[in-house]
């Protein structure tokens, strides 16, 4: 666990790779998404609960990813996730995919809270904002 975030282990499976045993570029997004989802669980809420109880969803608003070094078949990796900014309807996540101390990829992901009935951004519920603000 990071001081201001969360670490999540990921194993690279055959299904994640191309014919050369290198992780296909889109799979990195899966790794980052899983880590954000598990991070939310550690803060005692899930996207499913927000959806069912409040008709709210977290959606990716912007995403920037930098591929530095290739991940390969059977690598055991760690996704490090930190919150760098919390605003009314958005949270900015900084994520790194690591093999030991080597950074393989990094991503900046801005996630927005959307009211699914209106399909418009809305402020995060108080309990969600409080969970992230205590980390700052």
From Swiss-Prot:
This is Acyl-CoA thioesterase YbgC. CDD domains: 4HBT. Its EC number is 3.1.2.-. Belongs to the 4-hydroxybenzoyl-CoA thioesterase family. InterPro entries: 4-hydroxybenzoyl-CoA_TE, HB-CoA_thioesterase_AS, HotDog_dom_sf, Tol-Pal_acyl-CoA_thioesterase, YbgC/YbaW. Keywords: Hydrolase. SUPFAM superfamilies: Thioesterase/thiol ester dehydrase-isomerase. Pfam families: 4HBT_2. It is an enzyme of class 3 (hydrolase). The active site is at 18. Displays acyl-CoA thioesterase activity with short chain aliphatic acyl-CoA thioesters, such as propionyl-CoA and butyryl-CoA. Enzyme activity is relatively low, suggesting that the acyl-CoA thioesters used in the assays are not the physiological substrates. Has no detectable activity with 4-hydroxybenzoyl-CoA, lauroyl-CoA (C12:0), arachidoyl-CoA (C20:0) and arachidonoyl-CoA (C20:4). One of its GO terms (molecular function) is fatty acyl-CoA hydrolase activity. Changing residue 18 to N: Abolishes enzyme activity.
């Amino acid at each position: 666990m990071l001081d201001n975030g969360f670490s999540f282990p990921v194993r690279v499976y055959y299904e994640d790779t191309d014919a050369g045993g290198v992780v296909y570029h889109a799979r990195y997004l899966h790794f980052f998404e899983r880590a954000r989802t598990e991070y939310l669980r550690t803060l005692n809420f899930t996207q499913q609960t927000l959806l069912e109880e409040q008709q709210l969803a977290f959606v990716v608003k912007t995403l920037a990813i930098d591929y530095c070094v290739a991940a390969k078949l059977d690598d055991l990796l760690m996704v490090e996730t930190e919150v760098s900014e919390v605003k009314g309807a958005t949270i900015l996540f900084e994520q790194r995919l690591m093999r030991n101390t080597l950074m393989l990829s990094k991503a900046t992901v801005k996630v927005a809270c959307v009211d699914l009935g209106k399909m418009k951004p809305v402020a995060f519920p108080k309990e969600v904002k409080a969970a992230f603000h205590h980390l700052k």
